[in-house]
Amino acid sequence: MTKAKFEIDNAAARALFLDRHALTNRSTQALTEADLYALIHKLGFVQLDSVNAVERAHHMILFSRGSGYRRELLHTLHHDHRSLFEHWTHDASLIPMEFYPHWHHRFAAAKARLKHPNWSSRIGDDPAKVISRVRAHIRKNGETLARAFEDKGGGGWWGWGPSKTALEHLWRTGELAIVRRDGFEKVYDLSTRVIPDDLREARPTRKKTIDWAARTALARLGFATHQELAAFFALISIAEAKAWAVAALKRGDIIEVMVTGEDGNAKAALALPDIEAELAAADTPHPELRFLSPFDPAIRDRKRTLRLFGFDYTIEIFVPEKKRKYGYYVLPIMEGDRFIGRADMKAHRGDDRLEVKGLWLEKGIKLDKARKQSLEAALAELGQFTGATRIDAGAPLRRAKA
């Protein structure tokens, strides 16, 4: 007889998922460098994004998990301590430095891809010459911004000039590293000057990286499909994650579970064998209200967010204004273990004002006195973090209460 799969009810699944994403409790104490590193290590990475409508994604993601977060700490970990490195997961991210060896496979894949004429031609008619010139410049001058080179536009990626495209080529293939960001501009240097030798020279096999990526992702998600494991770091393919799961199930390294969604339907997923202990140890989500970045890792997979929380969320930044349902920069509102609404916001830094352009509550959610006070407190806290001395939210709050 086939053994029945362990079942996880929706409330328990939410609690574990939010615990893994550091969203069950929120520290109000000032975070230390060690605290911040531990948080990023727990998450796996923190995504970088340049959009500054309210706050840049990396800062907002970390602030959502601790109001004592300070922006300069992230710079300290990345630039001063070299505890983090910047490269790609599903997007540009800051990643714990100890994970660096596994990115050699990404470097090799980028090197093979960039040899193709469709890619190399973006550097110009003589890509080898441009790359050699850029490499020589950095070897001689050290830390370099793209604007140190005079050739601009006229092709390349996103209108970049040949030298900027060559910089990206050398970074994507691991020859260069990003030392820090000035504003949001990348500062490049040779990897030999940035990455510790032991990590830079390590070469884990593909098999080891597949095992590491899948296990590390599963530990940070609590439960997942093989597709979700592959997507976590975007280091391995879906086929590789599936093959790993099949083998790991046979060995007993992982088990299959059934996870109940918000709609009551259950979906099969993978979990570590100690899942019952993990569920028991997960913190109960605190009922505090908080805003999340549109790029928060907890909502990155929209289908999973809908399945687990019943929250249908889409980033509308790239949607033409007239076709947007909500707004340009809409932040999900979380209360305990559920999403209760969303708010379109903009920080007007010229006049120190945080504007709530629109507020929409989920079906069945009422803006009673207690929730209104919690919302106003969360807005005041976010306003303080963004440097706003005034919160302009009166009209949306009145409409939401009506």
Predicted regions and their residues:
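Long, charged, low-complexity, helical-prone intrinsically disordered regions
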Residues: M1-A402
